[in-house]
Amino acid sequence: MRKVIGIGETILDIIFRGDQPSAAVPGGSVFNGIVSLGRMGINVGFISETGNDRVGNIILQFMRENNIPTDHVNVFPDGKSPVSLAFLNEQSDAEYIFYKDYPKQRLDVLFPKLEEDDIVMVGSYYALNPVLREKVLELLDQAREKKAIIYYDPNFRSSHKNEAMKLAPTIIENLEYADIVRGSLEDFLYMYNMQDIDKIYKDKIKFYCPQFICTAGGQKVALRTNLVNKDYPVEPLQAVSTIGAGDNFNGGLIYGSVSYTHLRAHETV
């Protein structure tokens, strides 16, 4: 059975409405997509790390409840599990503050065994962080060797926009590994100060990875490949919260792909 393996951060999101906390739920960009897939009965795995504390226990229990094995989560004895504060505005968009205290030794964990046509999800700053780069590359190399499909979501946030130039070589390396790239217009604004989808694809993506999907919140979804140039309208809706919207888009897209037993990246588009 095909597997979907993610690597990324697990964090406890404390959600505020009107300056009052309303909920506390485990989150993380790749993690959110894996949770959606686990709930849908897909065979998933997640590579991550958390502290040996109450927050870490909440995260691990949440994973078990959502059909995600915890075998590949490094529970570190030093440091603390990360926490974020998510402040929702009137449009239910979130502004984040992060609190992190990681140990020096990171991601000391065995990776799951990959097979051909498995899907590997990578993204966010976790896939760019120099401290974790060696481990991320180890997974990407294994995926390439086993002919797994690599799905890359840059999920590049405003907190890192001043590092965009410094991180550019690592972003390019991730694009070179990727079989499918899915990003939002917001990501590319912070990465490249660009908002034109066709220009982003032509100048920044296509040379490295021909399969590109770009979302724009409540606006259209754009698909660009060597053979396809299509835009898909998005039905209007009243969002309860936009937290994890792009992450769950990833989950839905991958769920559709996994429904086809022998679907390679170039066949999906």
Task: Report each predicted region and the residues it spans.
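Short beta-strand/loop segments at the ligand-binding rim of alpha/beta enzyme cores
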Residues: 149-150
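Short glycine/threonine-rich catalytic loop with a Thr-x-Gly-x-Asp
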Residues: 26, 235-253
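Glycine-rich phosphate/adenosyl-contacting loop at the front of the ribokinase-like
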Residues: 1-69, 240
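Short, conserved phosphate/pyrophosphate- and ester-handling motifs at nucleotide-, phospho-/glycolipid
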Residues: 37, 184, 246
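Conserved N-terminal subdomain of the carbohydrate kinase-like
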Residues: 43-124
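Active-site metal-binding loops of divalent metal-dependent hydrolases
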Residues: 10, 125, 154, 248
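Conserved phosphate/ATP/ADP-binding segment of small-molecule kinases
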Residues: 146, 160-231
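Single conserved hydrophobic/aromatic residue that forms the stacking wall/gate
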Residues: 262-265, 269
